[in-house]
């Protein structure tokens, strides 16, 4: 075995990779029982109509001193009211300027509901949609709303945005929506194209600034510019597929875009390009032989990983595995997607090193294996230096991190 063939990664144990069908069914049954046990004391949490006690526990979860929660607050602006039309409040400005913790890892001893959910996501996949919570909803729909801190729904707002009809970006939206997860029959049956168009048009109207006053059109309001850009159709798809209603999907999608990855949807896709740059840095650090093999074939992340970074891996089937990966990204931050892509490269490592034309393999990635990717990613994160990890954390949302790309 040559030095280039020797992987620097340890092989983590996975929960469901390589199992027979019957074994996978047993794992799914165990998963459902574990999540049902976790949710039993939290039945009142299921949805925006949660009790005051539940809201208080979620608020405590949002302000915990764990490094994971601190980072998620910084990424999402959690708990602060979103400002419409692309602006940000004074509170969110302070949030963006706050210093990051030096490291991030799954909570070791979760004590509040949201922390317990995050911990469980790392160890146990969420049950399939056929398994419902005690309140009759899917586990994933409840978990995503809790992780995104969705406390209420404004149905009237969504209806008013939909009533505006075609947005200024309608033609661009229509050019993309018919291609969204086109090979996934389950998605096409559950999410009709008109729903996706309606949600994206409403998002554009929500941030349309044509009628802004001069006072609102100041430098502070121009930090983020929200409209429709390439890839947003794919980012919206998992929300429409997962959430119980279109209004819930719109609320979660809006929160996700505005707080988790606003720089990924700027006109220049600055956050995406920064993520690709960081992917190259991480791969060179974690697996120099593979990095130099790809660079020797003139392959940088900009060439082979653009779709995976832009869509947070949602462009790679199958959809159920994408949703499992997104459980992890929503729990610990979308910045982890960069390391998830490095993990995929590790899984393909032997084939890539043996190939004289690795781009042929990278152009058609193997099906996602979410549990394996998550386990490898958690292992990789331990070897990332604090300064590089801080760059990873900030790149989806902090304007300073993409100054060179604007």
Give the role of each language-model region.
Residues 1-225, 236, 240-243, 397-406:
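N-terminal transition regions in large eukaryotic proteins
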Residues 184, 188-189, 193-223, 276, ...:
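Active-site-adjacent structural elements in folded domains
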Residues 135, 224-228, 245, 249, ...:
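Secondary-structure capping and boundary motifs in well-ordered enzyme cores
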